[in-house]
Amino acid sequence: MRPSERAPDVLRVVTLETGVNRYAEGSCLISFGHTKVLVTATVEENVPGWMRNKGAGWVTAEYGMLPRATHTRGRREAALGKQSGRTQEIQRLIGRSLRAVVDLKALGERQISLDCDVLQADGGTRTAAITGAWVALRIAVNYLLEEGVLKTDPIVGQVAAVSCGVFKDTPVLDLDYEEDSQAEADSNFVLTNVGDIVEIQATGEKRGFTRGEFEQLFALAEKGIGELFVKQLEAVSAAKPR
């Protein structure tokens, strides 16, 4: 039995609230159970120096945790003077995941930055950030299309992510912190709505895991992400015009 009493193939309660930042071109507050991540999308009419004069845009992401997002207070990375390796890894993952479903040439020479701030962490912050970031990005691009800034939609699909793991020898979907801290193996899956794999991170924590267990984890991820795609579209559809 899982601590949350969920069945192995059941997500936590997932909500996506849009329009939570009045200034950003797109915003989304996503919750996976007690994990809460605020994502804002900012459109800038320029690109990084290495992208100039290439006729294409860029999508990037930053990720951070509020000091009391976890059980004990952590110092702000700005106060420490540098980002941790974990932070850099996660924000690169978010950026890669979003660019997998964006035609950068259709975006034109502009950049969209997704800022992902973890308000509360209870496992799965990176997967929540990816899933919520797509919603914020979609809303921002819709705004550019409505304003006539873009003539062609640069977003070519959906992307979402979820964690899976082996908990007490049972493959389960969407681990919370209690499960993740005790799991024999854990993984993160990033998939598109046409079934393409963007990234899979899988690690044996307390033991190795079998090919059969991996395939069960993959099947759970496909099921969970399929449900997330529906929730993403519902959130975008319900978003009020800026």
UniProtKB/Swiss-Prot annotation:
EC numbers on record: 2.7.7.56
Catalytically driven reaction(s): tRNA(n+1) + phosphate = tRNA(n) + a ribonucleoside 5'-diphosphate
GO function term, MF aspect, one: tRNA nucleotidyltransferase activity
Root EC class: transferase
GO biological process, one term: rRNA processing
Positions contributing to phosphate binding: R86, G124, T125, R126
Pfam families in the cross-refs: RNase_PH, RNase_PH_C
InterPro entries named in the record: ExoRNase_PH_dom1, ExoRNase_PH_dom2, ExoRNase_PH_dom2_sf, PNPase/RNase_PH_dom_sf, Ribosomal_Su5_D2-typ_SF, RNase_PH, RNase_PH_bac-type, RNase_PH_CS
Keywords on record: Nucleotidyltransferase, RNA-binding, rRNA processing, Transferase, tRNA processing, tRNA-binding
CDD domains: RNase_PH_bact
Keyword match Amino-acid biosynthesis: no
Keyword Nucleotidyltransferase: yes
Highest taxon listed in the record's lineage: Bacteria
UniProt function note: Phosphorolytic 3'-5' exoribonuclease that plays an important role in tRNA 3'-end maturation. Removes nucleotide residues following the 3'-CCA terminus of tRNAs; can also add nucleotides to the ends of RNA molecules by using nucleoside diphosphates as substrates, but this may not be physiologically important. Probably plays a role in initiation of 16S rRNA degradation (leading to ribosome degradation) during starvation.
Protein family membership: Belongs to the RNase PH family.
Quaternary structure note: Homohexameric ring arranged as a trimer of dimers.
Protein name from the UniProt record: Ribonuclease PH
